[in-house]
A protein has these predicted regions:
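Bacterial carbohydrate/catabolite-sensing allosteric modules
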Residues: 1-142
Length: 142
């Protein structure tokens, strides 16, 4: 989440704590409730970023129930790039993580830790992903 806050700062976007609502991972009902909270704010967000594509489905339902259109009234973006993200209509915009490379690197670090525990230095690894451009993200409003 530190990268999210860094991205806000680097792009001159105001940090809005009321927009940061926790929801359970991979839980459409929880995401739907969180989305309703966001939509009840006087100053609604223009885009909601969900922790995973399955949660986005719950948020999308709440947006439709509120009579709003995606992306005309509000944009939504997922994270994972699971198969459902390509089958969903309108096709969702999502961040696709490179799970295979991430898993390989994690396994290599685990093996190093097991084989040389006294020499192992914990480290943070980053793996580049990609954006799946769908139809749920509008141009930023000025």
């Amino acid at each position: 989440i530190a990268s999210f806050y860094r991205g806000l700062k680097e792009n001159g976007i105001e940090e809005r704590p009321e927009y940061m609502i926790q929801a359970k991972y991979h839980d459409p009902k929880s995401a739907g409730r969180a989305t309703k909270e966001l939509l009840e704010l006087n100053d609604k967000p223009t885009c909601i970023f969900y922790p995973d594509d399955v949660s986005l489905l719950g948020g999308y339902t709440s947006i439709q129930e509120a009579g709003l259109r995606v992306p005309e009234d509000i944009s939504i973006v997922g994270y994972d790039g699971v198969e459902i993200s390509r089958m969903f209509r309108p096709m969702m915009t999502t961040y696709i993580q490179d799970s295979k490379t991430l898993g390989t690197k994690a396994a290599q670090l685990l093996i190093e830790r097991i084989e040389e525990p006294k020499l192992f230095i914990p480290q943070q690894i980053s793996v580049q992903g990609e954006i799946q451009k769908g139809m749920t993200l509008a141009e930023a409003k000025k």
